[in-house]
């Protein structure tokens, strides 16, 4: 008999509860620090992860819950500028599309949030390396805690 996907996911969440609880606390502290210091939340991802990054950025800027009246929080998703992405990729390759945008947009008050299901995407890893080298806070949201992006 095939197991219910909800039950499977619930088991995974329960097995990782302590790890997730601590991770959520750390991420919350980082976001609070960035917001208090007038920094930006900068999101990136590829494919479905790009969609997640764009959605999260929209939530911070626009508060998509109409009952929630608050000021917008500076946020951007690096996957939205198709003119830059296609031009840079055509001339220089896809591996540095996010790193290049971080060079132009990010500073030490900001946080770079990288979404990657595999955690092995070169453009994500290169952006994390750049952010770390410049003292920009980084958060990696991946499908594997053993991935290259998670180790950074």
Task: Go through the PLM ranges and name each one.
Residues 1-19:
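Generic N-terminal amphipathic, Lys/Arg-enriched alpha-helix
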Residues 140-152:
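Short, glycine/polar-rich helix-capping loops at beta-to-alpha or helix-loop-helix junctions
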């Amino acid at each position: 008999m095939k197991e219910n996907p909800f039950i499977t996911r619930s088991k995974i969440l329960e097995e990782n509860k302590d790890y997730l609880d601590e991770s959520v606390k750390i991420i919350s502290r980082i976001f609070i620090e960035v917001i208090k210091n007038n920094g930006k939340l900068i999101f990136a991802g590829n494919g479905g992860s790009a969609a997640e990054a764009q959605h999260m950025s929209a939530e911070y800027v626009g508060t998509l819950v109409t009952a929630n009246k608050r000021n917008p929080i500076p946020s951007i998703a690096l996957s939205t500028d198709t003119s830059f992405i296609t031009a840079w990729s055509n001339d220089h390759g896809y591996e540095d599309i996010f790193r290049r945008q971080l060079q132009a947009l990010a500073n030490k008050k900001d946080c770079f949030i990288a979404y990657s299901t595999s955690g092995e995407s070169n453009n994500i890893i290169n952006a994390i390396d750049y952010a770390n080298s410049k003292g920009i806070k980084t958060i990696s949201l991946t499908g594997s805690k053993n991935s290259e992006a998670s180790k950074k």
